[in-house]
């Protein structure tokens, strides 16, 4: 599998090239082009976790209720083009399996099928912040696509930093945070 971010900046999108038998997962509604030999299915689950309850929890976090899963159906390989619903930048994150990533509402675009996706509740502070009640929790070894309305700036936090949760895209769970 090859994932390439195209058109960096305000009009970003991702081209996922699948080899025979490979699968990729995205938020429903992200697909804008697909090869004829790619099968896709829409479900409420990522891998073997969740189902209806996971879909409802994702909705509370500002994400889609459904996932789309793309599978290369023959021996030739194929392509899937994904774009965020709102124009903005797309970033590819390599997940090493040692840490968990948290994404904020609306920033998950897609991932390799070997990543586990769940919802992490922020508590009453999340509800009072005016933003989503939860984050998507993503762990495992694989690749993750996130997006933002506008540009994504990667920041290494040394001491402390205050950022409005409405402007956070994704962060590793090793980062101590409060809402």
Outline where the language-model segments fall:
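Composition-driven recognition of glycine/serine/threonine/acidic- and proline-rich low-complexity segments
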Residues: 1-179
